[in-house]
Amino acid sequence: MTEAMKITLSTQPADARWGEKATYSINNDGITLHLNGADDLGLIQRAARKIDGLGIKHVQLSGEGWDADRCWAFWQGYKAPKGTRKVEWPDLDDAQRQELDNRLMIIDWVRDTINAPAEELGPSQLAQRAVDLISNVAGDRVTYRITKGEDLREQGYMGLHTVGRGSERSPVLLALDYNPTGDKEAPVYACLVGKGITFDSGGYSIKQTAFMDSMKSDMGGAATVTGALAFAITRGLNKRVKLFLCCADNLISGNAFKLGDIITYRNGKKVEVMNTDAEGRLVLADGLIDASAQKPELIIDAATLTGAAKTALGNDYHALFSFDDALAGRLLASASQENEPFWRLPLAEFHRSQLPSNFAELNNTGSAAYPAGASTAAGFLSHFVENYQQGWLHIDCSATYRKAPVEQWSAGATGLGVRTIANLLTA
């Protein structure tokens, strides 16, 4: 193992020879990051990405000024999907070190799970990984049920079964119950619902290669809410929370669903399929029906749902939708506290009616007359939330994954959103 490169922090500007905009400098003792007080966490993350780009794979965070947030900012920029890296962490107090260790364990799990090839991570594997993570932090306070394949059809989970039946790998619903109270009759405080499409070809509405090559990450919503629950537990979550992961492949085969098919859901809604690549909302609907049946105070669903959200926000923000202004404000406050990027996009009553069908109550995609794709997708989901005007948040996870590296992130998953949702659950 090579000797560690020392990384220190300074509030003084770099020597003029490095240029007036220099964020780091190099000397015989190692590398100094020059903080300016404007965006210190972002500066540290961007510098870490540059340090990794220099091929430095063993570092020691040394000297004064390091805390859990600054260490984490460094790791977010330093971590990448290829190769190995070693960080020697500075001395932190017990609480800060525990917080950092929990982030490293759980959010790295989220990033690594999203980055996993679809060949390795099918619907069953995703569900089991989620169970293993939550069980690791919750112990005997968690129970779960896995329903798959034809059992889904027999039990009325028609959206999930319809989307997933075209794959040889059976679709799976994970229903997990975290109940720290020990009381089987305890009310459910919150339900988390995640889209777990482990590979999305688009189905018969097939994607072009440029839009399909990152679709191993289409289970990013499921990974995010799983990580959020695990992280909230490490922060002392003492309320009952249920997790529903809707896991499937969306592939083409002789048994795959087709345009013009009509899906009848357990709540009586009939949906005409006019785009098999708008499959995420079809599987989430089943999870939202189950979540609503629990009568929780709070329902949060997370999904890499629309390209429209990415068009609006790029990969820099998660898109937030809600009819509940107070709840949306609480989520945005949590995001601010955790230094994670969320941006609220419009969701109005009229978006719920912008999915007309000639043959069913709903179409699974908006027509050219209604181009607000992210908002109409949220409007679609609202039809499966019993009390959609209160207590429901929809997160379109546009900041989950990057196809190419940028100055602060490597290519691949980011893990953004985990801490914000956990913060809201424990507030």
UniProtKB/Swiss-Prot annotation:
PROSITE patterns: CYTOSOL_AP. Its cofactor is Mn(2+). Its EC number is 3.4.11.23. Transmembrane segments: none annotated. The active site is at 207, 281. GO terms for molecular function: manganese ion binding; metalloaminopeptidase activity. Mn(2+) 2 binds at residues 195, 200, 218, 279. This is Peptidase B.
